[in-house]
Design a protein with these regions (language model features):
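Generic short beta-strand segments
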Residues: 27-31, 82-88
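Tryptophan-paired
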Residues: 44-80
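Intrinsic-disorder/low-complexity, polar/charged segments enriched in Ser/Thr/Lys/Arg/Asp/Glu/Gln
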Residues: 23-25, 67-69, 78, 104-106, ...
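Sec-dependent signal peptide recognition
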Residues: 1-3
Length: 126
């Protein structure tokens, strides 16, 4: 009984306010196409498509972008982000696209806030 009471009391510890995760909103644009982005499906099976934590080397799948936006929950840290995908634009065009802006340790991005927003500029692949 004493053990159960101590578990209950310890389980009610007040939140320290220190969240180890960040909710990251990813917004994509494609300046070379005048139409807006409706959807981007990332090919997570490719070696070049990743969200990678530089400290732990853990990789996360990149979600599908709806109306140019996707959200992912990541442990706070430093990340490399790169991906190839298929974009559908508001005028019906379909194109292969790439984001490689944070594809190396030298160009990585630091995500330390509880909420982060990244604006990613896509390149159309030929």
């Amino acid at each position: 009984m004493l053990l159960m009471l101590s578990v209950v009391l310890c389980g009610c510890e007040k939140d320290s306010g220190q969240n180890v995760f960040s909710i990251v909103t990813l917004n994509v644009t494609c300046p070379s196409v005048s139409a807006g982005i409706e959807r981007v499906e990332v090919d997570n099976s490719l070696d070049g498509s990743f969200i990678r934590d530089l400290n732990t080397r853990q990789e996360y799948d990149i979600p599908t972008f709806q109306v140019g936006t996707a959200t992912v929950k990541l442990r706070k840290g430093i990340y490399m982000i790169s991906f190839d995908g298929k974009a559908v634009f508001s005028d019906g065009q379909r194109k292969k696209v790439r984001f490689a802006g944070y594809n190396s340790p030298m160009t990585s991005v630091t995500l330390l806030n509880d909420k982060e927003t990244l604006n990613l500029e896509l390149t159309v692949l030929k």
